[in-house]
Regions:
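Short, acidic, small-residue-rich periplasmic hinge/interaction motif at the N-terminus
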Residues: 155-162, 191-194, 205-249, 287
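Short acidic/polar hinge/loop motifs at secondary-structure boundaries
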Residues: 177-180, 279, 297-324, 413
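N-terminal periplasmic accessory domains that precede
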Residues: 205-211, 256-259, 278-281, 307-313, ...
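Flexible loop and strand-edge segments within Gram-negative outer membrane beta-barrel domains
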Residues: 390-412, 418-484, 490-508
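Membrane-embedded beta-barrel scaffold of Gram-negative outer-membrane proteins
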Residues: 485-497, 601, 609, 648-702, ...
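C-terminal beta-signal and adjacent terminal beta-strands/loops
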Residues: 616, 685, 774-783, 808-868
Length: 868
């Protein structure tokens, strides 16, 4: 708690200093989206007409600086007038009809209405682009500027490259032209019967040119920006890394578990050597400590968490938002190491049709179909389908007789609806369904004759999940800052599974509601959110072993609470977010969740953030550790766990997370570059310790001592050449827990990791991506008391994996893609993933010692087709 007090004191000191320094200032800087010089004229004119004394909009940064008298005009009035002119700002969105009436050149890239324009990183492509080895089309607009400063397009202007007068194009009725670049040529010539011939140097092929004719003299204004495939918003108080669909297309990304292959922030590892389930790791902690949400509604959690990553298809995803450390109190109390929020494709702004088919040489096939239809100006409907087949039961790289991946089928789908009446009401609702049915174990296992016998070792699971969800919001027409929203979801998850002679079945019924109201106090300098939430879970478990034991465990857990969050934003350079929750758990009583975030941006290129707060969750020890059933380990004090009060007679897990990050942008090789450094410390007040240190048993007990994780990550992004993007990262982890046998590093967790991703994309449609991962050695749980044949070393080997993909887009609209790729091209895989595989029903059989890749080199291919 001491460092929380220090943090809050620091926040207060900074707040007072900032407030005093700005007391006499009436200058504001905020984001306004636009494209060209005509946009600049329109934006500045709208600001001045609204009462601003001066207004300067930057085409490069997409920001406007206004000076005004706050006693005479409010900043919100200026922003509203800019939006009325057709330009989205960080708070007000232009009317669709006004936007659509803008000039062709002014059609800037709009954001989804549910997002804040300030959350979009508008990044400049600063390379000159003249040394291309491929065809490139230059786009521009020719306009006439009157004495009043009004801009009107000029049609019929001849445009050609100096040095090749034969290749001539002409501006259309909107003054827009497009001409193919020819290598070595840098100057465009413009000619028209009513103006003097002139030549303009094209400084950057990637940028849209605006050529202005004033008094028969031509000049050029450069305006173009593009969005990166992944970026961090410098304006958001919370540090959120956003992975766009462009980033996801760098790899096959069949489902969510494969969507982080080109990212250094999140690790995805196999949970064990036989079930095929995967889990994420953030800040060195298991995925159970990070919060997975889908459009800010709870994602697969509780019993569904271990297999939940497979339930969301990669082609459904619009973007993934990764937030390390603590999150907003409005999203709940369970977040301890970070939050991953998945934004799915929405019917009102998605392509009408998207189809993807994927196949690899290991026998896996995936089909994906996305459909969207606008019924009328209020209603839209979408359908997202995913089907995954795996029927190669002979895949066994380690040659131990066990299938590396279970065979079977996974089907999932979403039907969703969107309603918007144009008067402030927005509603979304739909249903989700998942069915996952798979069988694994030894290659000769036959489910009809060998299930739950010693004839042959087998395992299987059938998971079914149904969810209904709704989001209803109302934005007050007279005050766009004031809104009220209601989030609802209900789900049922059912799992039936067996592992050799063990069986484990569970069922979870969940209901969730979150009511949120947000507004400002006087001005946007002071914002607040208040709300109330309810979460109910009904858990039923049945675990048994043939001729040994059978237990039934039931519990109902309900958590209700209220929350409040205040944001102080005196300028775009500073934010302070202070939040608190008060919840009541029917099993554990009252608890408080305080959280705080500070963001300070001393300049446009540097951003500092500090965060700290508390998280709490209830452990589901059996569902979260399915691998214990796929081994011969006995569960220590099993009877006490299954008959104990509350949840397994264990206390809730509680931790405090503190983080510091810095993001620095700069220019390198004449192009954009950036370095980020992250430091996070997580300290558990209580943790349910999962102890594998005795190779014959597994123990679950409350922490008696300390458990902590320290994470340091540094990442460098740069462009060494035109169209070539590079990212390099290094991460250092120090994760330790006081076990009954003493303080030890977390097993199966690499202390060191190196990462590199290269992406080379051409306008001709070719894309090349390469990812390198260097994983350091990992501590292995002790096997010292096993017979020598079944003993493992104290540490694993370090290893290197490489992935690569080549893609090509075809068609006039680039709407047909073919991609081929390979994963684990180094062909490194663990030679002994299953301990005592030769005696699966003996005393030393264990599938939980997986520290490296389970399978070797894999190749895949696929196609994508969409209609815009």
């Amino acid at each position: 708690m001491n460092y929380i007090k220090i943090l809050l004191s620091l926040a207060l000191v900074i707040l007072l200093n900032v407030q005093l320094s700005l007391a006499q200032q009436n200058e504001e800087n905020f984001t306004v989206l636009g494209n060209c010089g005509m946009c600049k004229k329109r934006i500045e004119k709208a600001a001045l007409e609204a009462g601003a004394k001066t207004a300067v909009w930057s085409q490069e940064t997409k920001k406007i600086t206004v000076v005004f008298d706050s006693k005479k005009v409010e900043l919100a009035t200026i922003k509203k007038n800019i939006a009325a002119a057709g330009h989205d700002s960080d708070e007000f969105r232009a009317d669709d009809k006004v936007y659509e009436s803008l000039h062709e050149c002014c059609m800037y890239g709009r954001l989804d209405e549910s997002k804040d324009p300030s959350d979009t990183e508008l990044s400049e492509n600063t390379d000159d682009g003249h040394d291309h080895d491929h065809d490139h089309e230059v786009t521009g607009v020719v306009v006439n500027e009157s004495e009043r400063g009004d801009l009107t397009p000029i049609a019929g202007v001849n445009v050609y490259w100096k040095g090749n007068e034969k290749n001539i194009t002409t501006t259309n009725e909107n003054g827009v032209f497009k001409i193919m670049h020819e290598k070595g040529l840098r100057f465009l010539v413009f000619s028209h019967a009513d103006m003097t011939l002139d030549t303009v140097e094209v400084k950057n092929l990637h940028e849209v040119l605006m050529v202005s004719a004033k008094n028969n003299v031509l000049g050029e204004v450069v305006v173009s920006r593009r969005q990166k495939s992944n970026y961090i918003s410098s304006l958001s108080p919370h540090r959120v890394e956003i992975l766009t669909s462009k980033e996801l297309f760098k790899a096959a990304c069949c489902d969510l578990s494969e969507s982080f292959e080109t990212n250094a922030s999140v690790d995805v590892v196999s949970s064990d050597a036989v079930t095929g389930s995967k889990q994420i790791q953030m800040l060195g902690l298991s995925g159970i400590y990070s919060q997975l949400t889908v459009e800010n509604l709870p994602g697969p959690r509780g019993f569904a968490a271990p297999l939940g990553l497979n339930s969301i298809a990669g082609t459904w995803i619009e973007s993934i938002n990764i937030s390390k450390g603590i999150g907003s109190v409005a999203n709940g109390f369970e977040n301890m190491s970070g939050q991953i929020n998945v934004e799915l494709k929405k019917p009102h702004n998605s392509e009408p049709l998207f189809f993807n088919v994927y196949a690899n040489n290991m026998g896996r096939t995936d089909f994906n179909l996305n459909l969207a239809q606008k019924i009328n100006h209020k209603w839209s409907v979408g359908l997202l389908l995913h089907d995954n087949f795996m029927y190669n039961k002979n895949m066994n790289f380690s040659d131990n007789g066990f299938r590396d991946m279970p065979i079977g089928n996974t089907f999932s789908g979403i039907n969703r609806w969107h309603y918007e009446n144009g008067k402030g009401i927005i509603a979304q609702f739909g249903v989700k369904y998942l069915l996952d049915d798979r069988t694994g174990g030894q290659k000769e296992f036959n489910i009809n004759s060998d299930k739950l016998t010693t004839n042959s070792y087998g395992l299987g699971f059938r998971n079914e999940r149904v969810e209904g969800f709704a989001k209803i919001g109302y934005v007050f027409p007279t005050n766009k800052h004031r809104s009220i929203g209601l989030q609802l979801s209900a789900s049922n998850y059912n799992q039936a599974s067996y592992f050799g002679l063990n069986s484990y079945d569970n069922e979870q019924t969940n209901a969730y509601a979150n009511l949120l109201f947000q507004d400002i106090i006087g001005s946007v300098t002071h914002k607040y959110k208040v709300g109330a939430s309810m979460q109910f879970d009904k858990y039923d478990e049945n675990l048994a072993r043939v001729s040994d034991y059978q237990y039934t465990i039931q519990r109902n857990e309900a958590v209700t609470g209220v929350f409040a969050e205040y944001t102080f934003s005196p300028t775009e350079n500073f934010d302070a977010v202070l939040g608190i929750r008060q919840d009541y758990n029917n099993l554990y009583g009252w608890f408080t969740t305080p959280r705080a975030v500070l963001r300070y941006q001393p300049g446009e290129s540097t951003t500092f953030r500090i965060s700290s707060g508390r998280g709490q969750r209830t452990a589901n020890i059996f569902a979260e550790n399915l691998g214990i059933f796929a081994s011969s380990r006995s569960i220590t004090s099993l009877n006490s766990l299954v008959t104990g009060a509350n949840a397994y007679e264990l206390a809730p897990e509680v931790s405090w997370n503190t983080g510091f990050t810095v993001d620095q942008q700069f220019s390198l090789f004449g192009r954009e570059s950036g370095i980020s450094v992250e430091l996070f410390h997580n300290n558990f007040q209580n943790q349910v310790v999962v102890d594998y240190e005795n190779p014959r048993t597994v123990s679950f007990y409350n922490l008696a001592g300390k458990s902590f994780s320290n994470s340091l990550q540094a990442e460098w992004q740069f462009m060494p050449a035109p169209h070539l993007e590079a990212r390099m990262a290094y991460r250092l982890l120090d994760v330790k827990t006081d076990f009954e046998s003493g303080r030890l590093s977390k097993p199966l967790t690499a202390k060191h990791r190196g990462f590199m991703n290269l992406g080379y994309n051409l306008h001709s449609g070719w894309g090349f991506d390469y990812t390198l991962n260097i994983v350091g050695d990992k501590r292995l749980p002790s096997t010292a008391i096993n017979p020598i044949a079944y003993q493992l070393p104290e540490k694993s080997n370090a290893y290197v994996t490489m992935n690569a993909q080549i893609s090509k887009s075809f068609g006039k609209n680039k709407n047909f893609d073919i991609y081929i790729g390979g994963e684990n091209l180094t062909n490194y895989f663990q030679k002994d993933p299953i301990l005592a595989f030769d005696d699966p029903f003996g005393s030393y059989f264990d599938t939980n010692m997986l520290w490296g890749p389970l399978t070797g080199r894999m190749f895949y291919t696929g196609i994508r087709y969409h209609i815009k």
